[in-house]
Structures are given as structure tokens and as C-alpha cells.
Amino acid sequence: MTNSLTTWDEPELAIDWARLGHVYVVGNGKGGVGKTTTSAHIAALVASDGARTLLIDLNGQGNCALLLGFANTERDDKGRNLFSAVTAGAQLTPVRNVRPNLDVVPGGQYVRRIASVLSAEMATKDDAKRVHLALAECLQAIAGDYRVIIIDTPPENPLLSNIALCAGRFVIVPMRTDEYSRQGLRDIAADIRGMREHNPYLMLLAVFVFGSGTSSKKIRREMAKSVSEDLGQSSDMLLESFVRHAESVASEMVKFGRLAYELEQEIENNPKYWEVRKGSAKNVTTVSETSRLVAEDFANLAAEVLTRAASKRAQMIEQGEWP
């Protein structure tokens, strides 16, 4: 409270945490571990089951639009609305029905400006709190329209990642089986602890391996032990589900703007090899058969994540800890 006649207190933010209990943040302090691919797949798979879903691309590259096939179209605002919402309190206006039941708030070049704008507004502790809760404040206004909300976070941009954490309930961490990913896990674990000052209900839900060989079972078992050591928690934090390495599928997803399960549906349209050889094939575009297996990986992952979240929610409700 101030007694000055020429200044006034900024109104204290009122975050209704009950509205944000279905927000999932996909993050890791390291890039190249599958955050965007995972975010897009979980969001689209949930939507395909009939649940209204929102995907927020808090990333300056805007790759969610690329994966979903609407990059560089009139629907892709390159993050302009997200920038206005987070920095100026504008209403979030998602792109509707990018897939049936799936809305998207695109990222892109305007998102890159968010951190520099907000960094200049963190002079006091109260200012810092307001900045960190900027996404939570604008998201809570539309959160009730959706059953699930997924936030894709950027690598190596602590402020944007922390803004996402302050709007989320559950954190999902993809990682590869290398030391760089382990450091990224330790970094985001520290961020989660720090951001609980602003978001007391934030929790690490699960860790999973992305881009692993199907025969690398021993490596994944060792990774489970490493995750337990890094987090100081039980080794079941690492999910059984993992996403296999499939370079051809990753390339085709970007090339065609289709997710793995959508590519799978096109396999039956692949031309026969003898038709291609004879030059009689009507369709010369082929889709990797491996897309079927990758689609199954993501379906298993999404199911395990949602089951674990539901179990955690039920446990907290029983204990009187869920807002």
C-alpha cells in the first residue's frame, strides 16, 4: 500500500489455481530432446479422443505450426497473440480446430521478444511475481474451455520456461540417454522448486526417454537409476513408455505437416515397389512403415502420462491438497 497521491499499487494478481489443474508443461533445460514433437502428439492424441485440447507453443521457432501443417499460413501469427497476451494482458485467441477438438496458440518470432520485454519489468519482488504469473493470468480466462492444456517450452530461455512452469500443474520431461539431458533434467528440477514460490501446486509428474533404440533396454534401465539419483526420488519417475529413434519418420512429419499417427494412416496408400519401378504408380510418395511403430509409442506415452496424472490428482483430492 502506498500513501502517495501520484502513484498507486498495482492490483495483486488473483490466480484461481483450480482452473489450471489440467495444464501440462513439457520441458527440459536442454534442446533437441523432443519437447515440441511430444507436445504436439499428446495434444493431438487427446483431441482425437474427443476432448477439447489446447496446445500453447511458447517457443520462438514456432515448430508446432510446422508439425501440424499450418506454418506460414494466415492462421500462423508467429506468436503475435501470445506476445500481446503475456506482455500486455490481451486475451488469448487460439487458432481453432487445427485438428478436430485441437486449438493452438502458435509460437514464432514474436515469442522471442517476450523475455526482453518482461525482463525490464522485474525491478521489485512484486514485479517479478507479476511477470512470472503473466501466462497463468491470461490462461485462466480460457482454461475452462478445455479438458487438457499442453505448453511446449523453449530450450535455454529460463524466463519463458519459468513463465510456463508458473502456469502449469504437471511437468513432463523428455530426455535422451546422455549426460546433457541429465543436466537439463537437474536444471528443470531446480526451476520447479524455485517456481513453487509463485505456483504452489506445480509438480514433476514424469520423465521419459525420447529417441532411444528399441534394443537399448540396458541403457534405459541405467537411465532410470540415474534419474532416481538426480531427483532424489523413487525410480518410477521414469516412465516405461519411450519414443523410439526413427529419423525417417521425424523427417516426414515436418515435410508433410503430419503427426506419426496421421502418417500411419497413409501407409496403405504407398505405391507398390513394382509400380514405381515400371513407372505406372499413380502416387510416388511413400510413407515410412516405421510411422506405425512411432505412433504406437506416442499413444502409449500419452496414456501413461494421463493415467499417472489422474492417479496423482485423485491422491491429492483424498488428502485435501488439490485446489
In which residue ranges do the predicted regions lie?
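P-loop NTP-binding core
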Residues: M1-P323
